[in-house]
Structures are given as structure tokens and as C-alpha cells.
């Protein structure tokens, strides 16, 4: 059985964050992961269709059906990386599947701690009995490695959503504090999931805030997986497209 890289590239054909133009950079992500998988004897799976209307369940929540999706497509697997399509992987990225110790793995979200803490406080107050989790253990759900022992946990995530769907949809619109990410972090802690943190090099998020995303492409010498999120003044995701295209061409076409 092979290890699987699972990502999503779904045309929501809407406006704003649902606009089709938001998908334009994803081809560079998918191409980079395709080449990394070929080099490391893994298989890439790209989900291109919604399972449920986005009004019923935000697209980010739908990835927690991935075990059912792979099973429905007769795909056998050992371990699975669930990764966002706004990432580029370095061609020489080490095989992180060999680093997991068969645990769930992710990377601490070294982004805006103001946003993270506000999100923790709000979701903790309304969904987790006022509990505040340790923000230093908060991960970005755009990079999570799992295996079949985590199937039940993913079902618990879906069950949590279904039990709280109406309120979750409401707070997603009103708080602007994320969708699945903070609740899933709480659930990882609440369910006692045996977890292993990988270093920042394996999910380099919020690179603009760290002043490492630049035309010299220096960041590609200091890490392995780059996530192009939280880019200021990113109208119609044009800067995401610019940087992902530039990074892909720098790494794969020079």
C-alpha cells in the first residue's frame, strides 16, 4: 500500500472567497505534489467535487470525509497527508511519512497569534465549555498526516459538525475566526489524540509576516513546504498566483 497525498481543487463558481479565480494558483501546487509523489513512491488524490453544498457544509469541513472518499474510490493506503492546495512542496523535501512514528502529525501554526487566540477564546466559550487550549500546541489544519487508526477521530469531527452545524455556520460568518481549524484543534486535545509536531519547515505559513517571502526566493533554501496564506492586499488572490507560479518555476523549471 502506498502513502497518499490528499488535496482539494473544487470550483465553487461563486464570488469573493468562492470565486473560480481563487483556484488558478492550485495547478502549481498540484503539479509540485504530483512530482514529489512520483519521486517518493506516493499517490496523489485530488478531490474535485463537493460532497455537500457549501451552504450546508463549508468546503474545509468536507475533507474529514477523506477516509470514506478513498474507500469509495477503491484506493488502499498506508498513511495520508491532508494538505491545502495553496502549498508548494520543494522537490527535495524529505519523506515526512517516515517521520510520523505512526502518530497524527502536524505543524504549529506560527501565524497571527492575535487571530489564533481570539479564535480559541470564541470557540472555547461557545463550543467547549469555556475551555481555552494551549495556543502553542495549535496546528494549521492545512497539513495533517494520519493513518487508519485516525478514522474514528475524523468521524468524531464530522459528528461534531453535524451536532453543531447551524451555530457553526453562523459563527463562521460573524466571527471571521476560521472554519474547521480551531474546533479540530480542540477535538485533538479533547479526544487525547497521540500527536507529533513536525517543525515549521514542513508547513511554512504566513511567510509575509515573517518577512521571508521575497523575490530572492531565499525561503526555498530554508524549508520544504510553503503555504501562501495571509498575504496582505491580495485582491482576487492575484498575489497568491504570482508567488506560487514564481516558486514553482524557480524550483521545477530552472
PLM feature spans:
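GT-A fold catalytic core of metal-dependent nucleotide-sugar glycosyltransferases
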Residues: 59-121, 145-146, 150-151
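Short, charged/polar micro-motifs that form catalytic or ligand-binding hotspots
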Residues: 20-23, 57, 134, 140, ...
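Short amphipathic alpha-helical segments and helix-helix/interface helices
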Residues: 30-34, 67, 93-97, 184-185
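A structural signal for short, well-ordered beta-strand segments and their strand-loop junctions
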Residues: 5, 44-47, 81-84, 105-107, ...
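Catalytic core and acceptor-binding pocket of nucleotide-sugar-dependent glycosyltransferases
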Residues: 65, 136-239
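N-terminal anchoring/stem segment of glycosyltransferases
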Residues: 1-77, 230-232, 247-254
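Short, flexible, basic/aromatic active-site loop/helix in glycosyltransferases
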Residues: 121-135, 152
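Short catalytic/ligand-binding loop motif for oxyanion handling, primarily in non-cytosolic enzymes
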Residues: 14-15, 52-55, 89-92, 97-98, ...
Amino acid at each position: 500500500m502506498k502513502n497518499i497525498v490528499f488535496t482539494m481543487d473544487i470550483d465553487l463558481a461563486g464570488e469573493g472567497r468562492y470565486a473560480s479565480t481563487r483556484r488558478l494558483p492550485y495547478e502549481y501546487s498540484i503539479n509540485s505534489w504530483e512530482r514529489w509523489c512520483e519521486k517518493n513512491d506516493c499517490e496523489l488524490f485530488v478531490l474535485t467535487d463537493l460532497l455537500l453544498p457549501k451552504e450546508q457544509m463549508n468546503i474545509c469541513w468536507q475533507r474529514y470525509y477523506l477516509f470514506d472518499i478513498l474507500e469509495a474510490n477503491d484506493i488502499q493506503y498506508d498513511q495520508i497527508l491532508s494538505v491545502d492546495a495553496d502549498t508548494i512542496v520543494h522537490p527535495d523535501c524529505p519523506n515526512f511519512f517516515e517521520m510520523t512514528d505512526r502518530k497524527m502529525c502536524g505543524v504549529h501554526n506560527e501565524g497571527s497569534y492575535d487571530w489564533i487566540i481570539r479564535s480559541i477564546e470564541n470557540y472555547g466559550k461557545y463550543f467547549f465549555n469555556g475551555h481555552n487550549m494551549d495556543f502553542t500546541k495549535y496546528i494549521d489544519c492545512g497539513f495533517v498526516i494520519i493513518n487508519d487508526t485516525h478514522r474514528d477521530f475524523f468521524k468524531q469531527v464530522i459528528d461534531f459538525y453535524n451536532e453543531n452545524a447551524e451555530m457553526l455556520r453562523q459563527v463562521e460568518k460573524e466571527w471571521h475566526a476560521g472554519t474547521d481549524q480551531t474546533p479540530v484543534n480542540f477535538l485533538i486535545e479533547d479526544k487525547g489524540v497521540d500527536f507529533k509536531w513536525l517543525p515549521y519547515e514542513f508547513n511554512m505559513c504566513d511567510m509575509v509576516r515573517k518577512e521571508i517571502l521575497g523575490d530572492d526566493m531565499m525561503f526555498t533554501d530554508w524549508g520544504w513546504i510553503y503555504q501562501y496564506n495571509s498575504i496582505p492586499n491580495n485582491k482576487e488572490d492575484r498575489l497568491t498566483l504570482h508567488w506560487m507560479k514564481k516558486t514553482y518555476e524557480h524550483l521545477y523549471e530552472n
